Amino acid sequence: MKVSDALLLVLRCLRQRIPEDRLIWLNRELLGYRQDDLEALSDHHMGLNMFLAWISEPRRRAPLEVPGYRFLEGVWGRIDRSGRLVSVMEPELAQRQIFCNIGIQQIELQLDEMEHPTEALFSLSFDERTGAEFFCESAELVRVYDHVRSKLIDFLDKVIAELRVA
């Protein structure tokens, strides 16, 4: 079963059984982190360039626990005429991490489109001024995906134990 399907099923099954604030993480992972989530993150991580792939209308949200596993390692660069990645040395592009705010379903789609999902290089963000892109190895997406799967299993184990006691 795909992690996105599992997240959706868990959300549907637990919506009336546990407090809504405990389900926010599931929703963020399923649909992606919102603009107001990203603003809260930038308050905690000044200087990190954020990849804003999904933005929606602001709503009241629970305080954000910074999901460190969603920071992807990479490099700012350009692909040269021979197809090689060339690093860009611009002071404002010194970050080597960006926050991946897209939902798990989008991550699944990205990985499905890659011929070799553990060896590919992909671009996450673009800087218009320099023409540079932020490149990551696809293994970074796999790492996020696996972490969410593991965290979901831990969450389910905990909730099942709590519901048995109640």
Task: Give the positions of each predicted feature.
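Internal, Lys/Arg-enriched amphipathic helical interaction segments that engage polyanionic partners
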Residues: 58, 65-166
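N-terminal interaction modules that seed assembly of large macromolecular complexes
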Residues: 2-60
